[in-house]
Amino acid sequence: MAGAAELDRARADLAAAFRWVARLGMNEAVANHFSLAVDDRGRRFLINPGQVHFELIRASDLLLLDADDAAVMQRPDAPDPTAWALHGTIHRRLPHARCAMHVHSVNATALGCLADPVLPPIDQNAAMFWNRVAVDVDYGGLAFEAEAERVCALLADPAKKVLVMGNHGVMVVGDGVADTLNRLIYFERACEVYLRALSTGRPLRILPDAVAEKTAREAEAYPGGGAPLLASIHRILIREGSDYRD
């Protein structure tokens, strides 16, 4: 289990991610949810309380749950039932997924509504996800326990860190908040560019497979990863006097 200082930092990082995603307009009403494992086994995790807008979430609001303790749903501040089903399952079944972010962002969700919901490598951002995205085309309703188990099985391969949840939204996983948030933002932008290119009705210029794979590997090895982004978000929020760390 993380020490007190480490846990405080984890809370602040996750709260900052909620605030930033809200600023980007990627959340939906008071739905959607993020989680972050805070112990070595990945079974204890932070998650947002149910029915609270991302723009209002503070570090102290985040719930500390045990993936093996379903009694958490009896708490007065229990998370959304689908949040518990999805994230509880992820932290029980997928120890490599330390952080998980689920949103119904417009562009990733629109991609998942296409008959062919695969993102082709039409630009540098899209190429970063080449062969690294799982796709679910068997939407079966709200993500309660059975649906959550089925969906999470699609992320069993550690190389697949994005799941396009067909007719639903997107789930992004990673090593921590910085890594996962960075991936979520880039994937949403890649989807936006692809959909805009499709909207022209003109032929697409798709990168060769070899170039896409090379780009993806280069991006994975790029120095810093998402850390500079998260550090910048903290600085911006602090400069603005945000209460996200409370």
Question: Which sequence ranges carry the predicted segments?
Answer:
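Glycine-rich flexible loops
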Residues: 1-246
